Amino acid sequence: MKYYDLIKSPIVTEVTNKLIERQNKYTFKVAKTANKIEIKKAFEHIFKVKVTVNTSNVLPRFKRKGKYAGYTAGYKKAVVKVTSGEKIAILAND
């Protein structure tokens, strides 16, 4: 896979914003087939920063909307810690 295919989107919530401010950790959705080594190489190539990576698989959850029921899509999440003094510009106002 190419580096740009591995990283899908940032996960932006209140919890992830606190992680960015306090611990310099960024959270992203990544390809399900990607491993830690590939994710690390992708971030270092695209953003030109040194990182450490933790990954986890987020399981599908059961959801219901009226009479319709189903499951949300599962995905792989990567929490990327950037070395101190460096940043990743994931939003326009960074």
Swiss-Prot record:
Family annotation (Gene3D superfamilies): 3.30.70.330
Keywords assigned by UniProt, alphabetized: Ribonucleoprotein, Ribosomal protein, RNA-binding, rRNA-binding
GO annotation (BP), single: translation
One Gene Ontology cellular component annotation held by this UniProt entry: ribosome
Leader sequence segment: none
Top-rank lineage group of the source organism: Bacteria
Annotated SUPFAM superfamilies: Ribosomal proteins S24e, L23 and L15e
Pfam families, per the entry: Ribosomal_L23
Molecular function terms from GO: rRNA binding; structural constituent of ribosome
Family from the record: Belongs to the universal ribosomal protein uL23 family.
Role description: One of the early assembly proteins it binds 23S rRNA. One of the proteins that surrounds the polypeptide exit tunnel on the outside of the ribosome. Forms the main docking site for trigger factor binding to the ribosome.
Subunit note: Part of the 50S ribosomal subunit. Contacts protein L29, and trigger factor when it is bound to the ribosome.
Protein name: Large ribosomal subunit protein uL23
Species in which this protein is naturally found: Phytoplasma australiense
Lineage: Bacteria, Bacillati, Mycoplasmatota, Mollicutes, Acholeplasmatales
